């Protein structure tokens, strides 16, 4: 792995990143240091990008069953700028507000990117959460139907954003489970 040119982050940039994210100054500096170690040689960190493979290989994401979706949602055309990485870390931080976490969870779980979490999406979510590819079709349908019966308020066999938001607002574990400590900061 290459290294960026060792430019220190400007004080003004650090203040701006703090104002625009839910990250502390130390977390931003820690992420900056990690980014510098991963980015291509000879690039200034604001001009450098990381691939989805580089980001998904970070220890905190490597074990996440949704790492491919997380990377897809937060990257731009499969590449991560430093600001993309900061945005991702901010959403998954403990300080991020519930509405922001719910918005990004919806985007991550909308596998087919049709603006809804439909039966196909729910089945993929269930299989990934249970780490199971050999679940019986009947059990998978039962679990999918149970989720829909609890959350699909208009009975159209899919969750709109507002239905998903309503369901997550009632879930006491959501805020605790939608956190990732990427950088060991």
Curated annotation (Swiss-Prot):
Keywords: Calcium, Magnesium, Metal-binding, Repeat
One Pfam family here: EF-hand_7
UniProt-annotated binding residues for Ca(2+) 1: 110, 112, 114, 121
Record keyword Metal-binding present: yes
Matches recorded under InterPro entries: CIBP (IPR051433), EF-hand-dom_pair (IPR011992), EF_Hand_1_Ca_BS (IPR018247), EF_hand_dom (IPR002048)
An annotated Gene Ontology molecular function: calcium ion binding
Superkingdom of the organism of origin: Eukaryota
Binding site for Ca(2+) 2: 152, 154, 156, 158, 163
Residues covered by the EF-hand domain: 62-95, 97-132, 139-174
CDD domains, per database record: EFh
Family annotation (PROSITE patterns): EF_HAND_1, EF_HAND_2
Subunit note: Interacts with ITGA2B (via C-terminus cytoplasmic tail region); the interaction is stabilized/increased in a calcium- and magnesium-dependent manner.
Additional free-text comment from the UniProt record: The binding of either calcium or magnesium may significantly increases the structural stability of the protein in comparison to apo-CIB (calcium- and magnesium-free form).
Protein name listed in UniProt: Calcium and integrin-binding family member 4
Originating organism: Homo sapiens
Lineage: Eukaryota, Metazoa, Chordata, Craniata, Vertebrata
Protein encoded by which gene: CIB4
């Amino acid at each position: 792995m290459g290294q960026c040119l060792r430019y220190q982050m400007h004080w003004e940039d650090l203040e701006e990143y703090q104002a625009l994210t839910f990250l502390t100054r130390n977390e931003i500096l820690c992420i900056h240091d990690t980014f510098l170690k991963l980015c291509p040689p000879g690039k200034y960190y604001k001009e450098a990008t990381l691939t989805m493979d580089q980001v998904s290989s970070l220890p905190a994401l490597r074990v996440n069953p949704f790492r491919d979706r997380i990377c897809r949602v937060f990257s731009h055309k499969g590449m991560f700028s430093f600001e993309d990485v900061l945005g991702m870390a901010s959403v998954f931080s403990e300080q991020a507000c519930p509405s922001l976490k719910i918005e990004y969870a919806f985007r991550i779980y909308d596998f087919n990117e049709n603006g809804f979490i439909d039966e196909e999406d729910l089945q993929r979510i269930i299989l990934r959460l249970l780490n199971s590819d050999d679940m019986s079709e009947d059990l998978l349908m039962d679990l999918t139907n149970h989720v829909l019966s609890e959350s699909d308020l208009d009975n159209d066999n899919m969750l709109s954003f507002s239905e998903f938001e309503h369901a997550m607002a009632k879930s006491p574990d959501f805020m605790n489970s939608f956190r990732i400590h990427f950088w060991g900061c």
